UniProtKB/Swiss-Prot annotation:
The keyword Magnesium does not apply. Keywords: DNA-binding, Methyltransferase, Restriction system, S-adenosyl-L-methionine, Transferase. The lineage of its organism: Bacteria, Bacillati, Chloroflexota, Chloroflexia, Herpetosiphonales. It comes from the Bacteria. Belongs to the class I-like SAM-binding methyltransferase superfamily. C5-methyltransferase family. The active site is at 75. Residues 2-417 form the SAM-dependent MTase C5-type domain. Pfam families: DNA_methylase. One of its GO terms (molecular function) is DNA (cytosine-5-)-methyltransferase activity. This is Type II methyltransferase M.HgiCI. One of its GO terms (biological process) is methylation. The keyword Transferase applies. It catalyses: a 2'-deoxycytidine in DNA + S-adenosyl-L-methionine = a 5-methyl-2'-deoxycytidine in DNA + S-adenosyl-L-homocysteine + H(+).
């Protein structure tokens, strides 16, 4: 019997992947403690595992005996924690809770999961401190994996840190990293999944056939989209956002805040196409430009009236004589339409509910069940009855098949199955 604890458990994605791996290896398991501070996530966890998670990990002092630790912990800067000791002190952070538990209970192994940004967070000091602390405990090795390589049609890069007591695991698993910008990721047709080499999963594989009408985009929004783009299939892969050019649709092209003339549309498109050029400044998302700078790439006899009209409609803003788009994607019902023949952008908790798809002649948002499938959750998994919470929870979760694959690799490479 292998006993494990599930910390920062969320809705149980790591536990699910771990238990699937153990079942495949023929190892009986028991979760002896789970901890999750969010009460709504606790509800979903209880619905699926029929156990009530304990709350705040910092308030749990005594743990039952266990062999393995699972944790998807939040990312926090260590250089600001424990000011008395300065850099390298992990006190006051949630990783410290993992550190104290590992030190006190010395489990056989662990799996930690975090965002890819952990490796560069606080100029790399956060990750360096984590690895240093684990090394001091004689634990730890890490890898970066993309969910799209594990029978999950989602571009999701995550850091997985695994450890064995008094041993350095030698993992064989690897992953194609893909594009840094999730919107630019395109799965290669010859790129086999490391989880199932016989099939590459695409968005179309996870779509529901008859989702409820409540997931349809509004008639007004659909009409605006079709008036601009023509055939619905042209929406595949399109991004709806006002501060980027490229394969994007903009609010002024749809008339979201008010219909625009062709001259006004041309002006706004020229502005976002040129404002990021280096000779205007090195700002990542573009610099506010003066009228003189704007005239270097857009000439029109009625330029002043065009710009004033756009300011009045809410597409353009002026700050101290400089101009910039009123940027963002919050004005759209959907900010990205998935390409059914590719993989999804990364699900995140804040806007998983605003991802769209064109399927069976319907222009709609993806459903909570489709979000679950993008994370590799089985259809037997029950999601929260409130859609807004279900979207957020799946955006916060882990990709179940990746956890399963990492655990299988760890146990097979270290011959751990014989220990339980």
């Amino acid at each position: 019997m292998l006993k494990f604890i599930d910390l920062f458990a969320g809705i149980g994605g790591m536990r699910l992947g771990f238990e699937q791996a153990m079942h495949e290896l023929g190892i009986e398991t028991a979760c002896v403690l789970s901890s999750e501070i969010d009460k709504h996530a606790q509800t979903t966890y209880a619905m699926n595992f029929h156990e009530q998670s304990q709350g705040d990990i910092t308030q749990i002092q005594d743990f039952p005996s266990f062999d393995f630790l699972l944790a998807g912990f939040p990312c926090q800067p260590f250089s600001y924690a424990g000011k008395q000791k300065g850099f390298g002190d992990t006190r006051g952070t949630l990783f410290f809770e993992i550190e104290r538990i590992l030190k006190a209970y010395r489990p056989k192994g662990f799996l930690l999961e975090n965002v890819r940004g952990l490796t560069t967070h606080d100029k790399g000091r956060t990750f360096k401190t984590i690895l240093q602390k684990l090394h001091e405990l004689n634990y730890g090795v890490y890898l970066i994996l993309n969910s799209s390589n594990f029978q999950v049609p989602q571009n999701r890069l995550r850091v997985y840190i695994v450890g064995l007591d008094q041993s350095q695991p030698e993992l064989t698993i690897t992953s194609h990293i893909g594009a840094t910008d999730s919107h630019k990721f395109k799965q290669l047709s010859n790129q086999a999944s490391l989880f199932d080499t016989n099939k590459i999963m695409l968005v179309r594989d996870i779509l529901e056939d008859h989702p409820l009408d409540k997931y349809n985009c509004s008639t007004d929004f659909v009409n605006k989209l079709l008036a601009f783009i023509g055939h619905p299939i042209k929406l595949n892969g399109k991004r709806l956002i006002d501060y980027r050019n490229g394969n994007s649709i903009h609010s002024w092209e749809l008339g979201i805040k008010g219909e625009c003339t062709s001259d006004e549309i041309q002006f706004m498109n020229a502005l976002i196409a040129n404002r990021r050029k280096k000779h205007f400044g090195a700002h990542q998302d573009g610099k506010k430009l003066t009228i003189e700078q704007i005239k270097t790439f857009f000439e029109h006899d009625d330029l002043d009236s065009i710009m004033q009209s756009l300011i009045t409609k809410g597409y353009l803003q002026e700050v101290n004589g400089r101009f910039n788009p009123v940027a963002g994607n919050m004005s759209f019902e959907v900010f990205k339409f998935l390409d059914p023949d590719s993989v999804s952008i990364t699900l995140v908790s804040s806007d998983a509910h605003k991802i769209g798809v064109v399927h069976q002649n319907r222009i709609r948002r993806i459903t909570p069940r489709e979000c679950a499938r993008l994370q590799g959750f089985p259809d037997s998994f029950q999601f929260h009855p409130k859609d807004s919470l279900a979207y957020r929870q799946f955006g916060n979760s882990v990709s179940v098949p990746v956890v399963k694959a990492v655990i299988l690799d760890l146990f097979k490479s270290a011959d751990l199955a014989s220990c339980f």
